[in-house]
């Protein structure tokens, strides 16, 4: 029972981390690309 309760929490946390990390990486990548194009 304990494993069943811990696994969904870990999955939600994993999705939340990736949900925040992917847009951040793409946002930083777009900024660096824009600065590179300006030069």
UniProtKB/Swiss-Prot annotation:
Membrane-topology annotation of the record: Single-pass membrane protein
Lineage: Eukaryota, Viridiplantae, Streptophyta, Embryophyta, Tracheophyta
Top-rank lineage group of the source organism: Eukaryota
Location relative to the cell: Plastid, Chloroplast thylakoid membrane
Cofactor(s) required, per the database record: heme b
Listed transmembrane segments: 14-30
Principal subcellular localisation of the protein: plastid
PROSITE patterns: CYTOCHROME_B559
Subunit details: Heterodimer of an alpha subunit and a beta subunit. PSII is composed of 1 copy each of membrane proteins PsbA, PsbB, PsbC, PsbD, PsbE, PsbF, PsbH, PsbI, PsbJ, PsbK, PsbL, PsbM, PsbT, PsbX, PsbY, PsbZ, Psb30/Ycf12, at least 3 peripheral proteins of the oxygen-evolving complex and a large number of cofactors. It forms dimeric complexes.
Biological process, per Gene Ontology: photosynthetic electron transport chain
GO MF assignments: electron transfer activity; heme binding; iron ion binding
Assigned protein family: Belongs to the PsbE/PsbF family.
Note describing how the cofactor binds: With its partner (PsbE) binds heme. PSII binds additional chlorophylls, carotenoids and specific lipids.
Cellular-component GO terms for this entry: chloroplast thylakoid membrane; photosystem II reaction center
Keywords: Chloroplast, Electron transport, Heme, Iron, Membrane, Metal-binding, Photosynthesis, Photosystem II, Plastid, Thylakoid, Transmembrane, Transmembrane helix, Transport
Described purpose of this protein according to its UniProt entry: This b-type cytochrome is tightly associated with the reaction center of photosystem II (PSII). PSII is a light-driven water:plastoquinone oxidoreductase that uses light energy to abstract electrons from H(2)O, generating O(2) and a proton gradient subsequently used for ATP formation. It consists of a core antenna complex that captures photons, and an electron transfer chain that converts photonic excitation into a charge separation.
Gene transcribed to yield this protein: psbF
Designated name of the protein: Cytochrome b559 subunit beta
Binding site for heme: 18
């Amino acid at each position: 029972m304990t494993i069943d309760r811990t696994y969904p929490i870990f999955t939600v946390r994993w999705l939340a981390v990736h949900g925040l990390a992917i847009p951040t990486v793409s946002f930083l990548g777009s900024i660096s690309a824009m600065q590179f194009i300006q030069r």
